[in-house]
């Protein structure tokens, strides 16, 4: 038997695989504006990651159209990067002394889609008693947190050549500068998305659901966040 044309409330549980694209508009390292110099690398400006998370929904089936409220909580992303480079600034061939510059970058960043509370309207196309493809639209209130802690330290030091048969001497740094960019935000916004999928009727009341949804979480101040999700779940109509 298929799902039937009955109406009534329903609940749905899904397991979703999400591809997440996060874009941060941090100040550029070359930004001439005073106080807006940034040490954040491109890695933390343009983040692509993925996660698996559960989603629950409650709704009402009108016999073609459905409306539902859903809730999801995503996995927290965090990472750290450290890099160091040494560049020779000057070398004297007469005595072998040299002056070098050491650049160290330490970055720690995190992003967490804390919650998404959505409301969707879905239309089911009844092909037969078993299969019902569907399309829909979704509006959601999302909460995200993100932070970045980036430090760039530049040190210049002198190395003097020793006498023949002895090791060189590295002297304490004679010039050192340090720049840092720290930012932490907790933002709530309304975003829009689309839904598509297909339902397979197991019993008149129980449906296996395979779906896809795209959601733009809105302009989160200096951050843009978009998700593509593929999900598999079951829907039970009372």
Curated annotation (Swiss-Prot):
Compartments where located: Cell outer membrane
GO CC field: cell outer membrane
Signal peptide residue numbers: 1
InterPro entries: OMP/PagP_b-brl, Porin_opacity
Keywords: Cell outer membrane, Membrane, Signal, Transmembrane, Transmembrane beta strand
Bilayer-spanning residue ranges: none
Gene Ontology MF, one: porin activity
Location of region: Disordered: 88-109
Function as written in the Swiss-Prot or TrEMBL entry: Implicated in a number of adherence functions. OPA proteins are implicated in pathogenesis and are subject to phase variation.
UniProt similarity note: Belongs to the opacity porin family.
Name of the protein described by the UniProt record: Opacity protein opA68
Lineage: Bacteria, Pseudomonadati, Pseudomonadota, Betaproteobacteria, Neisseriales
